Amino acid sequence: MSDQSAAAKVVVVGSINADMRVGVERFPGPGETLAGGKATLTPGGKGANQALAAARCGVRVEMVGAVGKDPTADTALSLLSECVGLGGVVRRDILTGTAIVMVADSGENSIIVISAANGTVDSASVRAQAERVESANIVVCQGEIPSDGIAEAARRGSGFVVNFAPVIDVDSDVIRMADPLVVNEHEAALVAAALGSTTPHLEDDPDVALRELLGLGCRSVVITLGSAGCIVGGPEGFDSVAAARVEAVDTVGAGDAFVGALAAELARGRTLLKGCRFAPAVATATVTKPGAQASYPSTAEVEDIRRGEHA
Protein backbone atom coordinates (compact mmCIF):
# COMPACT_ATOMS: atom_id res chain seq x y z
CA MET A 1 0.00 0.00 0.00
CA SER A 2 1.41 3.42 -0.93
CA ASP A 3 1.84 6.18 1.66
CA GLN A 4 -0.93 8.06 -0.12
CA SER A 5 -3.29 5.10 0.17
CA ALA A 6 -2.35 4.50 3.81
CA ALA A 7 -3.24 8.09 4.71
CA ALA A 8 -6.52 8.05 2.78
CA LYS A 9 -9.66 7.21 4.71
CA VAL A 10 -13.26 6.69 3.64
CA VAL A 11 -16.16 6.45 6.09
CA VAL A 12 -19.39 5.06 4.71
CA VAL A 13 -22.53 6.03 6.61
CA GLY A 14 -25.16 3.73 5.23
CA SER A 15 -27.08 0.54 4.83
CA ILE A 16 -26.03 -3.01 5.63
CA ASN A 17 -28.21 -5.84 4.32
CA ALA A 18 -28.48 -9.54 3.90
CA ASP A 19 -29.56 -10.14 0.29
CA MET A 20 -31.98 -12.95 -0.52
CA ARG A 21 -31.18 -13.60 -4.17
CA VAL A 22 -33.47 -15.65 -6.38
CA GLY A 23 -32.81 -16.56 -10.00
CA VAL A 24 -35.77 -16.23 -12.37
CA GLU A 25 -36.21 -16.79 -16.08
CA ARG A 26 -37.93 -13.40 -16.30
CA PHE A 27 -39.62 -10.96 -13.94
CA PRO A 28 -43.25 -11.76 -13.05
CA GLY A 29 -46.03 -9.49 -14.23
CA PRO A 30 -48.77 -8.10 -11.96
CA GLY A 31 -50.71 -10.94 -10.32
CA GLU A 32 -48.37 -13.56 -11.79
CA THR A 33 -46.58 -16.29 -9.82
CA LEU A 34 -43.34 -17.73 -11.19
CA ALA A 35 -41.17 -20.58 -9.96
CA GLY A 36 -37.80 -19.33 -8.78
CA GLY A 37 -34.49 -21.01 -9.35
CA LYS A 38 -31.51 -21.12 -7.02
CA ALA A 39 -31.84 -18.99 -3.87
CA THR A 40 -28.92 -17.71 -1.80
CA LEU A 41 -28.41 -15.43 1.21
CA THR A 42 -25.46 -13.09 0.70
CA PRO A 43 -24.10 -9.85 2.20
CA GLY A 44 -25.32 -6.62 0.61
CA GLY A 45 -26.76 -3.17 1.18
CA LYS A 46 -25.60 -0.17 -0.81
CA GLY A 47 -23.57 1.23 2.06
CA ALA A 48 -21.84 -2.06 2.79
CA ASN A 49 -21.22 -2.68 -0.91
CA GLN A 50 -19.62 0.73 -1.34
CA ALA A 51 -17.50 0.27 1.77
CA LEU A 52 -16.18 -3.09 0.58
CA ALA A 53 -15.45 -1.76 -2.91
CA ALA A 54 -13.53 1.20 -1.49
CA ALA A 55 -11.53 -1.06 0.82
CA ARG A 56 -10.66 -3.39 -2.06
CA CYS A 57 -9.29 -0.30 -3.82
CA GLY A 58 -6.64 -0.06 -1.12
CA VAL A 59 -7.76 2.72 1.25
CA ARG A 60 -8.75 2.55 4.91
CA VAL A 61 -12.50 2.26 5.29
CA GLU A 62 -14.80 2.38 8.29
CA MET A 63 -18.53 1.72 8.32
CA VAL A 64 -21.17 3.55 10.34
CA GLY A 65 -24.49 1.72 10.38
CA ALA A 66 -26.67 -0.78 12.20
CA VAL A 67 -27.63 -4.44 12.04
CA GLY A 68 -29.94 -6.59 14.11
CA LYS A 69 -29.13 -9.28 16.63
CA ASP A 70 -30.61 -11.90 14.32
CA PRO A 71 -28.60 -14.63 12.53
CA THR A 72 -28.62 -12.75 9.21
CA ALA A 73 -26.45 -10.01 10.75
CA ASP A 74 -23.44 -12.32 10.59
CA THR A 75 -24.10 -12.91 6.90
CA ALA A 76 -24.47 -9.18 6.30
CA LEU A 77 -21.09 -8.44 7.92
CA SER A 78 -19.18 -11.49 6.69
CA LEU A 79 -17.11 -9.88 3.92
CA LEU A 80 -16.91 -6.43 5.49
CA SER A 81 -15.23 -7.93 8.55
CA GLU A 82 -12.23 -8.88 6.41
CA CYS A 83 -11.15 -5.35 5.49
CA VAL A 84 -13.57 -2.68 6.81
CA GLY A 85 -13.55 -1.22 10.31
CA LEU A 86 -16.84 -2.10 12.01
CA GLY A 87 -16.46 -0.16 15.25
CA GLY A 88 -19.21 2.20 14.07
CA VAL A 89 -21.73 -0.58 13.41
CA VAL A 90 -24.30 -0.95 16.19
CA ARG A 91 -26.32 -4.11 16.87
CA ARG A 92 -29.94 -3.35 17.73
CA ASP A 93 -32.98 -5.37 18.84
CA ILE A 94 -34.50 -5.26 15.37
CA LEU A 95 -34.18 -7.25 12.16
CA THR A 96 -31.14 -6.75 9.97
CA GLY A 97 -31.89 -4.91 6.73
CA THR A 98 -32.88 -7.27 3.94
CA ALA A 99 -33.06 -7.01 0.16
CA ILE A 100 -35.02 -9.45 -1.97
CA VAL A 101 -33.21 -9.57 -5.29
CA MET A 102 -34.63 -11.21 -8.40
CA VAL A 103 -32.00 -11.83 -11.08
CA ALA A 104 -33.34 -12.65 -14.54
CA ASP A 105 -31.56 -14.88 -17.03
CA SER A 106 -30.70 -11.69 -18.95
CA GLY A 107 -28.57 -10.54 -16.01
CA GLU A 108 -30.89 -7.67 -15.12
CA ASN A 109 -32.23 -7.38 -11.59
CA SER A 110 -35.27 -6.18 -9.66
CA ILE A 111 -34.97 -5.40 -5.94
CA ILE A 112 -37.25 -4.89 -2.93
CA VAL A 113 -35.49 -3.38 0.10
CA ILE A 114 -36.68 -3.76 3.72
CA SER A 115 -34.84 -1.14 5.77
CA ALA A 116 -35.26 -2.64 9.29
CA ALA A 117 -32.08 -1.76 11.27
CA ASN A 118 -30.96 0.64 8.55
CA GLY A 119 -33.91 2.82 9.48
CA THR A 120 -32.25 3.55 12.82
CA VAL A 121 -29.16 5.21 11.28
CA ASP A 122 -30.49 8.69 12.03
CA SER A 123 -28.87 11.96 13.09
CA ALA A 124 -28.42 10.78 16.69
CA SER A 125 -26.63 7.64 15.49
CA VAL A 126 -24.29 9.68 13.31
CA ARG A 127 -23.60 12.18 16.11
CA ALA A 128 -22.63 9.26 18.33
CA GLN A 129 -19.95 8.42 15.73
CA ALA A 130 -18.91 12.05 15.16
CA GLU A 131 -15.20 11.53 15.78
CA ARG A 132 -15.12 8.61 13.36
CA VAL A 133 -17.00 10.51 10.64
CA GLU A 134 -14.96 13.69 11.03
CA SER A 135 -11.68 11.76 10.68
CA ALA A 136 -12.45 10.76 7.09
CA ASN A 137 -11.14 12.31 3.89
CA ILE A 138 -14.38 11.27 2.22
CA VAL A 139 -17.77 10.46 3.76
CA VAL A 140 -20.18 8.47 1.60
CA CYS A 141 -23.97 8.17 2.00
CA GLN A 142 -26.80 6.59 0.01
CA GLY A 143 -30.59 6.80 0.06
CA GLU A 144 -31.14 3.70 2.21
CA ILE A 145 -30.90 5.43 5.61
CA PRO A 146 -33.02 8.22 7.14
CA SER A 147 -32.61 11.67 5.62
CA ASP A 148 -31.56 13.27 8.90
CA GLY A 149 -28.73 10.75 9.17
CA ILE A 150 -27.53 11.79 5.71
CA ALA A 151 -27.77 15.47 6.67
CA GLU A 152 -25.73 14.93 9.83
CA ALA A 153 -23.04 13.05 7.89
CA ALA A 154 -22.94 15.81 5.27
CA ARG A 155 -22.37 18.46 7.92
CA ARG A 156 -19.57 16.50 9.57
CA GLY A 157 -17.73 15.23 6.50
CA SER A 158 -14.78 17.20 5.09
CA GLY A 159 -15.54 15.66 1.71
CA PHE A 160 -19.06 14.40 1.06
CA VAL A 161 -20.20 12.01 -1.66
CA VAL A 162 -23.87 11.07 -1.87
CA ASN A 163 -25.39 8.41 -4.08
CA PHE A 164 -29.14 9.02 -4.09
CA ALA A 165 -30.18 5.47 -4.78
CA PRO A 166 -33.01 5.44 -4.06
CA VAL A 167 -33.95 9.13 -4.21
CA ILE A 168 -35.45 10.18 -0.88
CA ASP A 169 -36.73 13.47 0.52
CA VAL A 170 -33.63 15.34 1.72
CA ASP A 171 -33.13 19.05 2.34
CA SER A 172 -31.94 20.76 -0.84
CA ASP A 173 -28.93 22.22 0.98
CA VAL A 174 -27.72 18.68 1.71
CA ILE A 175 -27.93 17.77 -1.98
CA ARG A 176 -25.89 20.86 -2.84
CA MET A 177 -23.21 19.87 -0.31
CA ALA A 178 -22.42 16.70 -2.25
CA ASP A 179 -19.15 16.81 -4.17
CA PRO A 180 -20.04 14.86 -6.17
CA LEU A 181 -23.69 13.89 -6.35
CA VAL A 182 -23.77 10.42 -7.96
CA VAL A 183 -27.01 9.32 -9.62
CA ASN A 184 -28.21 7.34 -12.62
CA GLU A 185 -30.23 9.02 -15.36
CA HIS A 186 -33.61 8.35 -13.72
CA GLU A 187 -32.41 9.51 -10.31
CA ALA A 188 -30.90 12.62 -11.92
CA ALA A 189 -34.33 13.68 -13.17
CA LEU A 190 -35.90 13.10 -9.75
CA VAL A 191 -33.21 15.06 -7.91
CA ALA A 192 -33.47 17.91 -10.41
CA ALA A 193 -37.22 18.07 -9.83
CA ALA A 194 -36.63 18.11 -6.07
CA LEU A 195 -34.33 21.10 -6.55
CA GLY A 196 -37.02 22.97 -8.47
CA SER A 197 -36.41 22.02 -12.11
CA THR A 198 -39.41 22.16 -14.42
CA THR A 199 -37.55 20.82 -17.46
CA PRO A 200 -39.44 17.74 -18.72
CA HIS A 201 -38.02 14.35 -19.67
CA LEU A 202 -34.55 14.91 -18.21
CA GLU A 203 -34.20 11.14 -17.81
CA ASP A 204 -34.05 10.91 -21.61
CA ASP A 205 -31.04 13.23 -21.97
CA PRO A 206 -28.37 12.76 -19.30
CA ASP A 207 -26.18 15.56 -20.70
CA VAL A 208 -28.99 18.06 -20.27
CA ALA A 209 -29.77 16.62 -16.82
CA LEU A 210 -26.16 17.02 -15.73
CA ARG A 211 -26.03 20.68 -16.74
CA GLU A 212 -29.44 21.25 -15.18
CA LEU A 213 -28.24 19.89 -11.82
CA LEU A 214 -25.12 22.05 -11.94
CA GLY A 215 -27.27 25.05 -12.77
CA LEU A 216 -29.44 24.27 -9.74
CA GLY A 217 -26.43 24.60 -7.43
CA CYS A 218 -24.88 21.13 -7.27
CA ARG A 219 -21.12 21.35 -6.79
CA SER A 220 -20.31 18.45 -9.09
CA VAL A 221 -22.36 15.67 -10.63
CA VAL A 222 -21.69 12.16 -11.89
CA ILE A 223 -24.44 10.42 -13.86
CA THR A 224 -23.86 6.69 -14.26
CA LEU A 225 -25.12 5.13 -17.47
CA GLY A 226 -24.84 1.41 -16.78
CA SER A 227 -22.96 -0.41 -19.52
CA ALA A 228 -22.42 2.92 -21.31
CA GLY A 229 -20.15 4.27 -18.55
CA CYS A 230 -20.72 7.70 -17.03
CA ILE A 231 -20.70 11.44 -17.59
CA VAL A 232 -19.25 13.92 -15.11
CA GLY A 233 -19.32 17.68 -14.70
CA GLY A 234 -18.09 20.25 -12.22
CA PRO A 235 -15.52 23.01 -11.73
CA GLU A 236 -12.80 20.86 -13.36
CA GLY A 237 -14.83 20.55 -16.54
CA PHE A 238 -16.85 17.85 -18.24
CA ASP A 239 -16.06 14.34 -19.42
CA SER A 240 -17.75 11.26 -20.81
CA VAL A 241 -16.23 7.90 -19.92
CA ALA A 242 -17.14 4.73 -21.79
CA ALA A 243 -17.19 1.37 -20.04
CA ALA A 244 -15.53 -1.68 -21.55
CA ARG A 245 -17.92 -4.04 -23.32
CA VAL A 246 -18.34 -7.34 -21.51
CA GLU A 247 -20.97 -10.06 -21.34
CA ALA A 248 -22.98 -9.27 -18.21
CA VAL A 249 -23.76 -12.17 -15.89
CA ASP A 250 -25.23 -10.16 -12.99
CA THR A 251 -25.44 -6.36 -12.68
CA VAL A 252 -26.36 -6.31 -8.96
CA GLY A 253 -23.95 -4.08 -7.04
CA ALA A 254 -22.11 -2.68 -10.05
CA GLY A 255 -23.24 0.87 -9.33
CA ASP A 256 -22.12 0.52 -5.72
CA ALA A 257 -18.71 -0.71 -6.86
CA PHE A 258 -18.46 2.42 -9.01
CA VAL A 259 -19.24 4.68 -6.03
CA GLY A 260 -16.82 2.86 -3.73
CA ALA A 261 -14.00 3.01 -6.26
CA LEU A 262 -14.67 6.69 -6.92
CA ALA A 263 -14.68 7.48 -3.19
CA ALA A 264 -11.36 5.69 -2.77
CA GLU A 265 -9.79 7.71 -5.57
CA LEU A 266 -11.10 10.99 -4.14
CA ALA A 267 -9.78 10.07 -0.68
CA ARG A 268 -6.35 9.60 -2.24
CA GLY A 269 -6.52 13.14 -3.58
CA ARG A 270 -7.28 12.23 -7.18
CA THR A 271 -9.42 14.67 -9.14
CA LEU A 272 -13.05 13.84 -9.86
CA LEU A 273 -12.34 13.48 -13.57
CA LYS A 274 -9.51 11.01 -12.91
CA GLY A 275 -11.65 9.09 -10.43
CA CYS A 276 -14.41 8.77 -13.00
CA ARG A 277 -11.98 7.31 -15.51
CA PHE A 278 -11.03 4.58 -13.03
CA ALA A 279 -14.35 3.71 -11.35
CA PRO A 280 -16.14 2.35 -14.47
CA ALA A 281 -13.41 -0.26 -14.93
CA VAL A 282 -13.95 -1.54 -11.38
CA ALA A 283 -17.73 -1.59 -11.89
CA THR A 284 -17.40 -3.44 -15.20
CA ALA A 285 -15.28 -6.15 -13.57
CA THR A 286 -18.16 -6.95 -11.19
CA VAL A 287 -20.81 -7.72 -13.80
CA THR A 288 -18.89 -10.70 -15.16
CA LYS A 289 -19.52 -12.66 -11.94
CA PRO A 290 -22.68 -13.47 -9.96
CA GLY A 291 -23.48 -11.65 -6.74
CA ALA A 292 -22.88 -8.17 -5.39
CA GLN A 293 -20.02 -8.19 -2.87
CA ALA A 294 -18.97 -11.65 -4.00
CA SER A 295 -18.31 -10.27 -7.48
CA TYR A 296 -16.05 -7.41 -6.38
CA PRO A 297 -12.45 -7.62 -7.54
CA SER A 298 -9.81 -8.33 -4.92
CA THR A 299 -7.21 -5.72 -4.03
CA ALA A 300 -4.74 -7.48 -6.33
CA GLU A 301 -7.26 -7.49 -9.17
CA VAL A 302 -7.95 -3.79 -8.61
CA GLU A 303 -4.23 -3.10 -8.93
CA ASP A 304 -4.26 -4.97 -12.24
CA ILE A 305 -7.15 -2.75 -13.35
CA ARG A 306 -5.22 0.33 -12.24
CA ARG A 307 -2.14 -0.72 -14.19
CA GLY A 308 -4.33 -1.30 -17.24
CA GLU A 309 -5.80 2.19 -16.91
CA HIS A 310 -2.30 3.69 -16.93
CA ALA A 311 -0.86 1.44 -19.64
Spell out what each predicted region is:
Residues L52, T98-M102, S110-I111, I223, ...:
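Short beta-strand scaffold segments in enzyme catalytic cores
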Residues L79-D93:
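A glycine-rich helix N-cap at a beta->alpha junction
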Residues A66, G88-R91, V101-I138, G143:
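Conserved phosphate-binding/catalytic loop of the ribokinase/pfkB sugar-kinase fold
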Residues E82-C83, G119-A124, F160-V167, V241-A242:
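Short gly/ser/thr-rich secondary-structure transition/capping motifs
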Residues M1-V10, D169, A193-L195, T199-A311:
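Conserved phosphate-binding/catalytic region of the ribokinase-like
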Residues N137-V208, A228-C230:
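Conserved beta-alpha-beta core of the PfkB/ribokinase-like small-molecule kinase fold
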Residues M1-V64, P71-T75, A248-V249:
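Glycine-rich phosphate/adenosyl-contacting loop at the front of the ribokinase-like
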Residues A130-E134, I175-R176, G215:
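A short, aliphatic-rich alpha-helical micro-motif
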